[in-house]
């Protein structure tokens, strides 16, 4: 298959075969809200003060977070990608109910259609609801949020834990193998959903005139990947397929998530605004990047500041808060695998490689 975890792929191989597979696509952060905030405005989250995870909202899950969260807004004149498409006459929608941006925003000003709450997945799109409200011939810009590694029990058990590779920075124990196998199971389910999206577009006669960007906003949920800027947290698969995209290509040059917005606008013939820091990587005159940048800042109540710079040959990481351990208090603490890691560290059962991340000091 196009990627080693999707052999026999239903959807992902279709996109890879009909378009471009990008092997060195990097997200601007290793966590959902910072990456999504960056991608939706086409600029680094650190450039606009929208880098702290889940800021810019007055309440979260029914809890009042205070006025400091509510006051984070985009600078004057900076619009989101769906707002720019909507202003250009496009129908806009967001399937999956996730508009996880670190600034105060009104989804109703961004999207013409927000499906009824159904959780992550393409249910409304597969039913044709996402674009049925358009005027005849009206183009659309849509976002579809898939659960990926967060699908939980919705992903059937297919992968044998005994056969998965375990990175050296994790202890090779049954709990870790089960977690990794479940992640691959989720990817197979995601592949199935990508196939459903393609089928729905073809059914409604839209596929041949739709430019599709398929990518992840961050890496694997387990420790050292999600929220961090190692390769497992920020180097993601991405495919682009559609009109004007030559089939069967593989590109190995560096692409950043901030490049997606200008590429989308350029494809639609919409002017790219000056605040965008990315570049149209599909343009004929595109100059390949010399580097990409990623940032880790506050996630939930964990204070952190790490920066990464990746070139074609090297990677530079800088930890600013060296007085803090990597494993600060986290929402992952109640997980059985987290408790097992803590127990192993306390008993001296982790090796030197594993203690680099799980130890008491950076």
Placement of each model-derived feature along the sequence:
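Formylglycine-dependent sulfatase
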Residues: 1-360
